[in-house]
A protein has these predicted regions:
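Acidic, low-complexity intrinsically disordered regions
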Residues: 5-249
Length: 249
């Protein structure tokens, strides 16, 4: 090719412009926590609130660290047999105040599938037209599905698998010994076994926080931020499976 030709100049200029555009598109990072609010959570109510506030702190730190490439939002869905309460709903992290015990009051049963299906389906719909998004979903429960009316396990599995194609990161935090089996039925491979004590709850939120930090760092790397939107999604699919694995190596 003639490097002095107008054609070469146009191709080079187009490539440079596209690279610049990709590098300047901020990733909108949605952090969704689906938190059990059934009656059995009352014994660790304070620890759950404190742990979630630590999660907010982790996200605030990530926003400052990656201010040029990421914009963080938080959603907290607290669920029990009374329904799903969106305590935060795609709230910019700069506007998210700490959770208080007055806002998180455990009671009644565990409609786990309804909580997952309702919140994920709505978030998926809300961000469908955003140019570049990354999503982290953490599901925390000390019990088992026992009260859902709208969603079944197979439908939840299909929904999660569909979201994972877009690079969503999912984690299932459970107190039962058969957590791996429960998580696998809905296609979640990232799991944290939760010792439901004061110290165990602190450790659980810390583990989830570190995994999210790794995810934020990976999607902020130049290899990702300078890639096309399609390639970013491909990278996130890989990152979503690596971030929890790294904590057990």
């Amino acid at each position: 090719m003639d490097f002095d030709s107008p054609l070469f100049f146009c191709i080079t200029r187009k490539t440079t412009i596209m690279e610049t555009m990709n590098a300047t598109i901020k990733t909108l990072v949605y952090n969704l926590v689906i938190l059990d609010k059934s009656g059995s959570m009352e014994s660790i109510r304070k620890e759950a609130v404190d742990g979630y506030n630590e999660t907010l702190g982790t996200i605030r730190t990530a926003q400052l660290k990656h201010i040029d490439t990421q914009e963080h939002f938080v959603s907290l869905a607290a669920f029990c047999g009374c329904g799903v309460e969106m305590i935060y709903d795609k709230t910019p992290i700069k506007d998210a105040e700490n959770l208080t015990q007055d806002r998180y009051v455990p009671c009644c049963m565990t409609p786990l599938y309804d909580a997952i299906g309702i919140t994920i389906q709505q978030l998926k719909k809300d961000i469908a037209h955003a140019e570049d998004t990354a999503v982290s979903v953490t599901i925390i429960t000390d019990g088992y599905e026992n009260a859902s009316k709208e969603w079944k396990g197979d439908a939840i599995k299909n929904l999660i698998e569909d979201c994972k194609k877009d690079g969503w990161m999912f984690a299932f935090v459970g107190a039962g010994e058969d957590i791996l089996k429960v998580a696998s039925t809905i296609s979640i491979t990232n799991t944290v076994l939760w010792d439901k004590t004061e110290e165990g709850t602190r450790i659980m939120f810390s583990v989830a926080g570190k995994a999210n930090e790794r995810f934020y760092d990976k999607i902020a790397a130049p290899c990702c931020t300078e890639a096309s939107i399609a390639d970013r999604k491909k990278m996130r699919r890989q990152f979503a499976e690596e971030c929890y694995d790294a904590l057990t190596e």
